[in-house]
Curated annotation (Swiss-Prot):
Induction of its expression: Silenced by the DNA-binding protein H-NS under standard growth conditions.
Function summary: Component of the type II secretion system required for the energy-dependent secretion of extracellular factors such as proteases and toxins from the periplasm. Part of the pseudopilus tip complex that is critical for the recognition and binding of secretion substrates.
Source taxonomy: Bacteria, Pseudomonadati, Pseudomonadota, Gammaproteobacteria, Enterobacterales
Species in which this protein is naturally found: Escherichia coli (strain K12)
Residues carrying N-methylmethionine: 7
Stored PANTHER family: TYPE II SECRETION SYSTEM PROTEIN I-RELATED
Residue ranges crossing the lipid bilayer per the database entry: 7-27
Protein family per UniProt: Belongs to the GSP I family.
Official protein name in the record: Putative type II secretion system protein I
One GO biological process term: protein secretion by the type II secretion system
Protein transport listed as a keyword: yes
PTM characteristics: Cleaved by prepilin peptidase.
Length: 125
């Protein structure tokens, strides 16, 4: 009698389980990479919004003031808030722009400006 060659049922099941484990691991890794790319995209857009606000609001204005607004990018609404405070030693004004991402996370960008002690006005360095 001729002996047939091939895989037994046990070998087929083992090969299928190994393939399934590898496929699930790859899918999980790809999902993690996709989430990381989305977070980096949102972080970059938030920093662009904050930088644009710092550039458009070139003068610092009064200390201990706040303002806020919204930007629409790619159909998503991004909220920003500008806060101006003086430093503890009174030589610098600090403007912080905080952008709230659509997911609820926040990103901040800060700019410092020296204060001219004679006039009390802020001046760029």
């Amino acid at each position: 009698m001729n002996k047939q060659s091939g895989m037994t049922l046990l070998e087929v099941l083992l090969a299928m389980s190994i393939f399934t484990a590898v496929a699930l691991t790859l899918m999980s890794s790809m999902q993690g990479q996709r989430n990381a790319i989305e977070r980096m995209r949102n972080e970059t857009l938030a920093l662009w919004i904050a930088d644009n606000q710092l550039q458009s609001q070139d003068s610092f204005g009064e200390e201990n003031t706040s303002s806020s607004g919204k930007e629409l990018i790619n159909g998503e609404e991004w909220n920003w808030r500008s806060d101006i405070h003086s430093s503890k030693d009174g030589t610098l004004l600090e403007r912080t722009i905080t952008v709230t991402l659509p997911s609820g996370q926040t990103t901040s960008l800060t700019r410092y400006q020296s204060i001219d002690n004679k006039s009390g006005q802020a001046q760029d360095d």
